[in-house]
Amino acid sequence: MAWTRDQMAARAARELTDGAYVNLGIGLPTLVANHIPDGVDVWLQSENGLLGIGPFPGEDEVDADLINAGKQTVTARAGASYFGSHDSFAMIRGGHIDLAILGAMQVTDRGDLANWMVPGKMVKGMGGAMDLVAGVKRVVVLMEHVAKDGTHKILPQCDLPLTGVGVVDRIITDLAVFDVTDGGLVLVEAAEGVGLEELRAKTGVAFVVQTRG
């Protein structure tokens, strides 16, 4: 059975390491903030100038002036800091962010990423995605395995405008987790009840299964 959006976010939260500086992309990746594992202290950064994002606020905690880059209201943890977008992008471009968890429309088995534009459709635009994939130390994609019409999102080549070439390190979907390697995709984990036959049918490229040592 496919993971729910919250289960996907919880799985992505397992990628977080203690003391890391992390940027969460708009959309599904923002849910990761609600699933940070106990004992893991991370600093979540947003392009609009906030370091130290906390979980999403409850109804009595909403501050309309405190938002992330996707214009969602957020909370700030103790020790959070606020600054201009020029400083925020300097952190990103300077290689000071350890991990970015981003959404995607298409990804290839070589780690190419398309996540900012669909021709003919209104989308929020590029935002900081190109800066993130160029400057962050590790990039994880969090997305549904296939599009709403059932077409593949993991492909040999993106047909949407690219955000970056060879930039993705790991892909987490509602069905599985893949590592992007020089030899292509390696299946690391599958959601409970999801078999290889289903994965191969819903993945637009070949992959190998990680061997357990």
Swiss-Prot record:
SUPFAM superfamilies: NagB/RpiA/CoA transferase-like. InterPro entries: 3-oxoacid_CoA-transf_B, CoA_trans_fam_I, CoA_transf_AS, NagB/RpiA_transferase-like. GO terms for molecular function: succinyl-CoA:3-oxo-acid CoA-transferase activity. It comes from the Bacteria. Pathway: Bacterial outer membrane biogenesis; lipopolysaccharide biosynthesis. It catalyses: a 3-oxo acid + succinyl-CoA = a 3-oxoacyl-CoA + succinate. Pfam families: CoA_trans. Gene3D superfamilies: Glutaconate Coenzyme A-transferase. The active site is at E47. Keywords: Lipopolysaccharide biosynthesis, Transferase. Coiled coil: none annotated. GO terms for biological process: lipopolysaccharide biosynthetic process. Its EC number is 2.8.3.5. NCBIfam families: pcaJ_scoB_fam. PANTHER family: KETOACID-COENZYME A TRANSFERASE (PTHR13707), SUCCINYL-COA:3-KETOACID COENZYME A TRANSFERASE SUBUNIT B-RELATED (PTHR13707:SF57). Heterodimer of a subunit A and a subunit B. Belongs to the 3-oxoacid CoA-transferase subunit B family. This is Succinyl-CoA:3-ketoacid coenzyme A transferase subunit B. The gene is lpsJ.
